[in-house]
Amino acid sequence: MKASLIISVYKDTRALRAVLDSLKQQTEQDIEVIISEDGEDTKMAEFIRQYDFLWPMQHLTQPDEGWRKERALNRAVVTAKSDWLIFIDGDCVLHPRFIEWHVRMRQRGVMQAGKRVKLSPQLSERMLQGDNICFFPYLFWHRGCRYVEEAFYCGLAQWLRRPVKHLVGSNMSMSRTDLMAINGFDENYTLPATGEDYDIEWRMQANGCRIVSLRNLAVQYHLYHKENWQEQERNMIYCRAQQAKNAYVCKNGIHP
């Protein structure tokens, strides 16, 4: 297989169905799917049991004890059968060529970074009901959508690269070997944001890796939900302390 797709989920089976349905439309299907659940929700387990998967699939759970996404991701990394890991969230629907580009451009020493358009509540509902709106780009100008420029697929983007400054945890891929070299995700992050993307970014860069842009190639549609970043600064305080020490191999990761 060419890649292991790791999908982070928490309770929202309706969004996950939309994501998995978009996965069935991919031009590249030589993957395994790992559903990485930060919890043990019975409705999630029942949905996964009944869903018609087209790919090898593993469902990993852990006790719901607050935000422990980094721990869930580390367990998925260890379980993965491919050396190329693609990370997405369970509320991000995929353009049909999403997997193709993450696989096509893969190489050791590289972190691949895409972006996402944030959908309005109305467009999110249409996607949840099964509408394939990615082929109707004018819809993304709907009031309430954000980062609309990220909604458009353009094959020419492989030559006319729009740079990215940072990883986004819902749209990134990298070598399992490279990620293991920094001991995976730092499980000291117990709040949303930073730990699943920016922290990985600076530590892998410190270990010699670089970012390659997949903007407008690996396109992703983020379903609407309320977001709360009020506690992000606590994560950044810890992150800056680790950067000051150049501690790019975390102590509380895959191997404690």
Residues covered by each model-derived region:
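A short, conserved alpha-helix in the catalytic core of glycosyltransferases
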Residues: 171-183, 190-209
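Short, acidic, metal-binding catalytic loop of nucleotide-sugar glycosyltransferases
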Residues: 21-30
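Conserved donor NDP-sugar-binding/catalytic core segment of glycosyltransferases
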Residues: 97-136
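A conserved acidic beta->alpha catalytic loop
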Residues: 37-47, 92
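Short beta-strand/loop segment that forms part of the nucleotide-sugar
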Residues: 30-40, 58-62
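Short, flexible, basic/aromatic active-site loop/helix in glycosyltransferases
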Residues: 132-164
